[in-house]
Amino acid sequence: MDLDLLKKAVDASSEGIVIAEREGDDNILIYVNKAFERLTGYEADEILFQDCRFLQAGDRDQQALNDLKVALEHDESARVVIRNYRKDGSLFWNELSISPVFNELDQLMYYIGVQKDVTAQIAAEQRADKAEEELRLLKQKFGIE
């Protein structure tokens, strides 16, 4: 397949796509597509050859990050929803799917990450949860089962 065509196809994706390479305990970004740049506000040349932990901006106390770490330690695929932060500091909820890429000797070479902004979906779920809790409290207050 023509590599130029492949790059154009990946850059045309509406979801952020990254390729990372393991380097010690880090997974270093070696490629990000245009959608990743739009999603995060970072240009590729600002963030390549860094671990993508910078997207958490110190917000590392997330169960999903622990789940992701376990998957990475076992060279497995994973899908998690994590809090990330754009270059301007604004929060977004990131549905991250990662998949390992192995060579012909079954050795881990890279991880492919696909990132999708699910902030609106999470906000809707939080509003629904709040409404359900308010309804439960009203029922409790008035003795309605």
Over which residues does each language-model region extend?
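PAS/PAS-like sensory domain cap-loop motif
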Residues: 36-47
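Sensory modules in modular signal-transduction proteins
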Residues: 1-25, 29-34, 140-145
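Sensory-domain boundary capping and coupling elements
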Residues: 96-98, 115
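PAS-family sensory domains
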Residues: 22-23, 83-88, 102, 107-120, 127
